[in-house]
Curated annotation (Swiss-Prot):
Disulfide bonds: none annotated. It comes from Aliivibrio salmonicida (strain LFI1238). The gene is trpR. Keywords: Cytoplasm, DNA-binding, Repressor, Transcription, Transcription regulation. It comes from the Bacteria. This is Trp operon repressor homolog. Residues 59-82 bind DNA. GO terms for biological process: negative regulation of DNA-templated transcription. PANTHER family: TRP OPERON REPRESSOR (PTHR38025:SF1).
Amino acid sequence: MSGSAKYSDWSQVMALIANAAEQNKHQSLLTMLMTPDEREALMARVNICHELLQGDLSQRQISQLLGVGVATITRGSNELKSHTDDEKAWLMEVLEVSAKSDQGARKE
């Protein structure tokens, strides 16, 4: 026993995920690491960010749409506020492209 956690920094976890992605095993890794509830929470956060960045709905409307509490929406909003406009534009682009490519894959 080493006496300390092997992964003690967020960058180490990101490197682990990047390594798995390079091997096309990222889905397996995240499925093994996260419970179904944690995966649902992550999907909710992705949808929260997408809706907040679109800016079409109020936080209360997003809460009702996604079935999450207003406090959860507020936490997501506060996190987004800590990022630059360029970072938010990049995230929106990635979310849009990923959603479109997934929809195309489902039709096949």
